[in-house]
A protein has these predicted regions:
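Non-heme di-metal
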Residues: 1-222
């Protein structure tokens, strides 16, 4: 198997449809002021459809998180060099793969529970692209600190949506996955400190990459 797998070669069946993140950002429907409102509020007429779309986004995001964590286990030789990953980091990422695989299964079943199906909404691949930076430290800040941190807000939103609509299944599952995301963020922060303790320039570059991913994922980078 080759290392540093390109995003174009991700394995997907015919149900999946891919879209570039810039296409989503500049979609006229998303630029409409009404699209900036809380589309999951109980009094919002399309809240159920919006929730299904968000759930599908969580599902494909968890697939990419699994793929990205797995690539970090495989892409780098074990070691302490800049182009290597310590064995302990690879082990932590292997553990995270188990979490992400569980999240994929849960999210897929939640999609069914909410009346959605795989491929009903398009997939964009920002998460996997951030997860496959050539520097393992930038992977940590781009995914574990930035995207996993933002995922905490997403899971909270879906948990609260489930509570407001009296759906204990959705609320419980989102709260369960939320607990894992907190540990992923902490793991990324811990390894960032360890790997850049004697390299402030590398730490600066990693934090700048985190900010860039934050802006991009929050639709503020274009």
């Amino acid at each position: 198997m080759k290392r540093f797998w390109p995003v174009t070669d991700l394995a997907r069946d015919e149900r999946f449809q891919r879209i570039r993140i810039e296409d989503a950002i500049f979609d006229p429907r998303n630029l409409n002021p009404e699209a900036q409102q809380n589309g999951l509020a109980p009094n919002y007429e399309t809240s159920s459809d919006n929730a299904r779309g968000l759930m599908h986004g969580i599902f494909v995001g968890e697939i990419q998180a699994l793929e990205g964590a797995g690539r970090t286990c495989f892409d780098f030789e074990a070691g302490n060099g800049r182009d290597e990953a310590p064995f302990g980091l690879k082990l932590d990422m292997a553990r995270q793969c188990w979490d992400e695989a569980r999240h994929v299964e849960i999210s897929c079943k939640l999609g069914d529970h909410m009346g959605s199906e795989i491929g009903e909404f398009a997939e964009q691949t920002l998460l996997f692209e951030a997860a496959c930076n050539a520097d393992p430290v930038l992977r940590l800040t781009g995914v574990n600190r930035a995207l996993e941190g933002l995922a905490i807000d997403v899971f909270k939103t879906m948990r609260d949506f489930g509570s407001s609509f009296g759906d204990p299944v959705l609320s419980f599952c989102e709260d369960w996955m939320l607990a894992d995301e907190v540990t992923h963020v902490k793991m990324g922060s811990d390894w960032l400190r360890r790997l850049t303790a004697d390299d402030p320039q590398r730490q600066k570059e990693a934090l700048e990459f985190q900010k860039a991913v934050d802006k991009l994922f929050s639709f503020g980078g274009f």
